[in-house]
UniProtKB/Swiss-Prot annotation:
Its job: Part of the ABC transporter complex GlnHMPQ involved in glutamine transport. Probably responsible for the translocation of the substrate across the membrane.
Transmembrane intervals: 21-41, 63-83, 85-105, 132-152, 181-201
Induction description: Positively regulated by TnrA under nitrogen-limited conditions.
Designated name of the protein: Probable glutamine ABC transporter permease protein GlnM
Family: Belongs to the binding-protein-dependent transport system permease family.
Keyword Transmembrane helix: yes
Length: 216
């Protein structure tokens, strides 16, 4: 393995690492908030919202992430809104991941005893207050493992930015590979950078899961 490729192009790798990390953090936060909102829509008693939430999840989960990315990168300019590769990839990643997070959280909410909601309502809580303060905290504890898997998938799926010049690790690796005419070594180093992101995240999720188990 030619280590000099890493050192000679270290600034490009670090730039890609930064944009991958930034896109992952933004998409993680955005997809979690959106996923919670859609999950609540799916279990609400107001049928139009329930149908809208179900349609969103089923539609987004069953089309490729690449297609969603192309819609934002190539399609929006036709409507007068232009996003650069980083923005288009991050928005697509957020929307795509939110559908899977919504399903995980919906399952978590429905696993909480219905008596919890009834008790909260009888104590004077509104539906929104009961959901926010009573149901969701319990549901989040239950769905930490599947959420952790989705967050790990999100980091790995961030490589989609490379397809639309999103400045991420894969995009920078393509540039390095083109300039050095070396392929294998370049992408092995990229894999190591991804591990720097995913291993701490995996450890953190496992730690949080154990802490939450002790709190029961």
């Amino acid at each position: 393995m030619n280590v000099s490729i890493l050192f000679d192009n270290f600034s490009m790798y670090m730039d890609g690492f930064y944009h991958t990390l930034l896109a992952s953090v933004i998409a993680l936060a955005g997809s979690f908030v959106l996923g919670v909102a859609v999950a609540v829509m799916r279990i609400t008693v107001f049928k139009p919202l329930q149908w809208l939430g179900t349609a969103y999840v089923e539609f987004i989960r069953n089309i490729p992430l690449l297609l969603i990315t192309f819609v934002f990168y190539f399609g929006l300019p036709n409507a007068g809104l232009r996003l650069d590769g980083f923005q288009a990839g991050t928005v697509a990643l957020t929307i795509y991941t939110s559908a899977f997070i919504a399903e995980a959280i919906r399952a978590g909410i429905q696993s909480v005893s219905k008596g919890q909601m009834e008790a909260a309502r009888s104590s004077g809580f509104t539906y929104s207050q009961a959901m926010l303060h009573i149901i969701l905290p319990q549901a989040i504890k239950i769905v930490i493992p599947p959420l952790g898997n989705q967050f790990l998938n999100l980091v790995k799926n961030s490589s989609i930015l490379g397809v639309v010049a999103g400045l991420d690790l894969m995009y920078q690796a393509d540039l390095v590979s083109s300039s050095t005419l070396v392929v294998f070594d370049v992408y092995i180093f990229v894999a190591l950078f991804y591990l720097v992101l995913t291993i701490p995240l995996s450890i953190g999720v496992n730690y949080l899961e154990k802490r939450l188990e002790k709190s029961y």
